[in-house]
Regions:
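N-terminal acidic leader/helix
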Residues: 1-31
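Low-complexity intrinsically disordered segments
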Residues: 35, 41-89
Length: 89
């Protein structure tokens, strides 16, 4: 995996999650907008953190990017669980 493709993956996956949050907030104005806003802020922080880490690899690049990819999916999954909790209220 090269760096350019990885950065595009970060933009796609985090961007899609933010789009899902915004769509839910638009379709459900009666739900708690503050919680959705907080989840979006966490997603933006994740995006910035992943981009920063991708630009400054440490050690073996292949192992580093593999671990960073795993971290990205784990954190996005955690954010999805938070969004699901808000949706189910």
């Amino acid at each position: 995996m090269n760096l350019r493709v990885f950065k595009k993956d970060i933009e796609f996956f985090v961007g899609e999650f933010i789009d899902d949050c915004a769509l839910f907030a638009a379709l459900n104005p009666h739900k708690d907008a503050d919680e959705i806003s907080q989840i979006i802020d966490e997603a933006v922080d994740l995006y910035n953190d992943l981009k920063n880490k991708a630009n400054h690899p440490e050690g073996n690049k292949k192992a580093f990017y593999t671990a960073l990819t795993k971290e990205m999916f784990e954190k996005i999954d955690t954010l999805c669980e938070k969004l699901s909790a808000v949706v189910s209220k």
